[in-house]
Regions:
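Class II aminoacyl-tRNA synthetase-like tRNA-binding/catalytic domains
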Residues: 3-175
Length: 175
């Protein structure tokens, strides 16, 4: 059964299965250290090359690669991930990522061209979370004050991909 990173504190000492994407990988002589993330957080994985047979394949993974990991959740005070890490028993690679076309330091125009990649960076995600929290707060306040929320159609001055064929709206004697 799948476990989320945020649930690991209740699963110390148990064998867990996580579905993660790779953040970073450090490959040492006898061990590999992976920071993997899911929608709820980041966790450190410790892979013993003696124990896991596909450690050579794991060493080729790039940021964004998807995998399923099974292992024991243990307390680790030296871990950067809330004092918990996973001692890996098995790791199944689901999808290998390609080299990302941008970095966090890329020019803004290039980052907008690859916006779907840019949104994977923590700073960009944080900005979206802050915006979301602000909008939720505004919405809750206004609803508590008995305002009525409604949504209006968007009217634009140019033809859109498909909506412009539905109907025309006369506006200042223009169609």
């Amino acid at each position: 059964m799948r476990t989320l990173v945020r649930e690991l504190k209740e699963k110390i000492g148990q064998t867990v299965t996580l579905y993660l994407t790779l953040e970073t990988l450090r490959d040492q002589k006898h061990l590999q250290f992976i920071l993997g993330k899911d929608k709820s957080g980041i966790i450190q994985l410790v892979i013993s090359k003696d124990k896991v047979t596909n450690h050579e394949d794991i060493g080729t993974l790039l940021q964004g690669s998807a995998f399923i990991v099974t292992g024991k959740a243990i307390e680790a005070s030296q871990s950067k991930t809330f004092g918990i890490e996973i001692q890996v028993d098995s790791l199944e690679i689901i999808s290998k990522a390609e080299v990302w076309p941008i970095t966090q330091e890329s020019a803004i125009d290039l980052r907008f061209d690859y916006r779907y990649v840019d949104l994977h960076f923590p700073k960009q995600q944080l900005m979206l979370k802050i915006r979301n929290a602000f909008l939720q707060g505004c919405r809750q306040f206004l609803l508590k004050e008995e305002f009525c929320e409604f949504t209006t159609p968007s009217l634009i001055g140019r033809a859109s991909e498909s909506g412009s064929e539905c109907f025309s709206v006369p506006y200042f004697d223009k169609i």
